[in-house]
């Protein structure tokens, strides 16, 4: 049934070459002149970029510069790239024990729907999904499957460099639990462990999902 749906989408989905002129003009109004000319001519593929960038979460901060890098790479192969939409990204490491954690699983569906909104404009010939971590990758995966007639590639953000060794972090936590280290010492240890952009420095769901999409190609 799914494959039949995708075949139907291939034949029934309106391609940008079939969009009304007003629709198409809206779709490339903000593009650079060269990209605008390419999209007018229909001679080059247009690739959607769906990004989960935010600069609060270490795993998603690197995506700030990805769209420009991707556009340059696409230009080198005579294609165009547009950021079609952004999706939310949250971290259980921040919300754990707080009310915000109640939104964690729900965010997967929100991410899928947010990506679908961006792809719904029918301007694209393929899609790149910029996301990592345990709710973001599944949400983007759901969107990629819903738009399975568009070739898709997932782009992980990469791991955080190793910081404070886990044994040392555990030692400081134990001292804090025993009342032998204060909150400032504990915070310094945690900050030395999670200390830079990239996915968390342990084998958790962020790195697991990153490896899954890389293994899948």
Language model features with spans:
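Metallocofactor- and cofactor-centric catalytic cores in central/energy metabolism, strongly enriched
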Residues: 1-217
